[in-house]
Amino acid sequence: MGGCSSKSDPKDYIAHETRGPVPAEGGRHPHNGDSSRDRSDASRRRATNDPPAQERADRSNRRPNNNTVDFQEFKDKEKNVVETMLESNKGLRMAEINFNDLKLQKIIGAGAFGEVIKGTYCGTPVVVKRMLRNKITEDNLRMFGDEIQLMMNLRHPNIVQFIGASWNSYSNICFVTEFLERGDLFAVLRNPENHLTWAKPILRMTIDTSRGMAYLHSMKPPIIHRDLKSMNILVSSTWGAKVSDFGLSREKSVDETMSVTGTPLWLPPEMIRGERYTEKADVYSFGIVLAELDTRKIPYHDIKAKGARNKKVSGSTLMHMVAYENLRPSLSKNCMNSVRDLYKRCTSDDQSVRPTFEEIVQFLENDVRKETLVRANEEMNVIEDEQNNSDVSPEELGVHHATRYVD
């Protein structure tokens, strides 16, 4: 991939400085002390067969130190892993960008393998996901490479755009994606400054997410996200939504549809039970996101441990209840009927009952949109009735229109 400046060589690490012996206290040379004291010390050493201080220091330096790490050896090992896993991969080299074209500004998040940094690439705002130094292993680099190769082939308005990757320094193994101003949906829903309704802008974010997932499932073979949740849905300044974070995403295969991955609160029951799953696992996770959109709260926020007044249920207990007791997040009392119906179908224990994302998009654009408009009109009528029934006119309160309309 292109860059904004010429490609530069990797920066070498700065070697550790080797310091000489520390002078004696007060800056005096050891031989500049009192002569009688020196003779006394020499006599004491001869009596105890104790070697001079310098000889003891030499012996100490010759002893192996089990706590010492050979920095060059560590560096060479890292370099070998990176070159084996990344440099030799021609597909990844096509996505490489110059790290010098990136300007890192501030850390805005963290994950299991690295940190999320806001920055710019050639002056354009971007998100940089950089791998932590102590996470540079063959397995993690393989996952890193898999995610890059997957994102390189994804092109859709509701999928976060991949820009490039860089590993020209072993401390700067990272990949770059577009920056969305409002952050993730999890934060958006819990920000008290955001006055959200289904009419504006929840329905749009829901449809956008469904379209992005429908695109992933339309691939040949289908791509199963396996970690769909509100934290992996990013929101733009205009309330558009895009699916992100494909670290656990895989093309559908028999071998890989048996492994348990993802975040517990959004996991479908078949994955918890260790059963084979399909792309309908993502549909279940989307159903949990619907509950978040309805309540603006974390899933299962109201579930308490049995026999305890305010104690929360442990994660393992919660997962057991989801898998074997059909536990699902609760919805609000004001939840629209169409949303409640869609939620129940998405979170059904029977995978065949769950709709496809193409069907979800159609349902949202028709049934949910109609009910949203009806509810919005009802709310407007209530507001108008309250205003018409007011005993005090705006003029009496000193409020006057600045514009007069004439025929």
Report each predicted region and the residues it spans.
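Regulatory alphaC helix of protein kinase catalytic domains
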Residues: F144-Q149
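Short beta-strand micro-motifs within the conserved protein kinase catalytic domain, predominantly
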Residues: Q161-I173
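Conserved short submotifs of the Hanks-type protein kinase catalytic core
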Residues: Y170-D184
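Conserved catalytic-loop aspartate of Hanks-type protein kinases
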Residues: D282
